[in-house]
């Protein structure tokens, strides 16, 4: 019988049930220990990045190659007919006739949802403006499960740009579906989490990392995104910096893990990298396994793995 993820559009993390989240993570864990070979041979996947990306684009493309599939696409829309005035719908309609799935990153919120309305192949949202980034959330959940052994009964700090940061928007939506999670929202007032996202959360609001750090199981740091800031808010760019002095023995829980969607600028000092709490590079590496799992499940109807 065909499983529920087969040919499914991945637009929002809310599109996935807890059972589907577990299926993707279990498959990623399996692939991490047992690399897949030619599972998607003769499959062609489009990587359409209308906005700059390093980790997301390259981890998707590495995942595609490791699955035995082929990838076509672009990393900048200036090299496409969009730069000549072609509409997004015309571009993607044509691309969808060549491929089995489309990965899209776009600066406009809602672009992947729009594409899903007319493309006959699965659409995967690789980030749409300040809205969502569901595949980043999948690797975040996988990293939390890997380090904490659970996705419930956690104390989670979200720090930095909570207003424009799409990664924290998706992660909050996902973790709020698991029981007894408590959220500590740490940001300047100008960059606080949008009200619709916090309305149903068990949360508290804070303006410094130090005041909540001793309580946390997970600290999810984010970059203050200057490219999305209004000029009057640009002074906030370096407002939240985590340093080694904040992580001395006895000051934090032994199971604390620090995550970051990357790229970082200066919000995490380099000396933090060598502490046992830093997990952001392992988190980034997990992106390839999660994206392998997602593509394999979307494009294989029988999913012959756990």
From Swiss-Prot:
Protein residues bound to carbamoyl phosphate: 55-56, 105, 133, 136, 262-263
GO cellular component: cytosol
Entry-linked Gene3D superfamilies: Aspartate/ornithine carbamoyltransferase
Pathway: Pyrimidine metabolism; UMP biosynthesis via de novo pathway; (S)-dihydroorotate from bicarbonate: step 2/3
Function statement: Catalyzes the condensation of carbamoyl phosphate and aspartate to form carbamoyl aspartate and inorganic phosphate, the committed step in the de novo pyrimidine nucleotide biosynthesis pathway.
Enzyme class: transferase
Annotated GO biological process: 'de novo' pyrimidine nucleobase biosynthetic process; 'de novo' UMP biosynthetic process; amino acid metabolic process
Gene name for this UniProt entry: pyrB
Catalytically driven reaction(s): carbamoyl phosphate + L-aspartate = N-carbamoyl-L-aspartate + phosphate + H(+)
Pfam families per UniProt: OTCace (PF00185), OTCace_N (PF02729)
Protein name: Aspartate carbamoyltransferase catalytic subunit
E.C. no: 2.1.3.2
Single Gene Ontology MF annotation: amino acid binding
Family: Belongs to the aspartate/ornithine carbamoyltransferase superfamily. ATCase family.
Entry keyword set: Pyrimidine biosynthesis, Transferase
Subunit text: Heterododecamer (2C3:3R2) of six catalytic PyrB chains organized as two trimers (C3), and six regulatory PyrI chains organized as three dimers (R2).
InterPro entries membership: Asp/Orn_carbamoyltranf_P-bd, Asp/Orn_carbamoylTrfase, Asp/Orn_carbamoylTrfase_sf, Asp_carbamoyltransf, Asp_carbamoyltransf_Asp/Orn-bd
Residues annotated to bind L-aspartate: 84, 166, 223
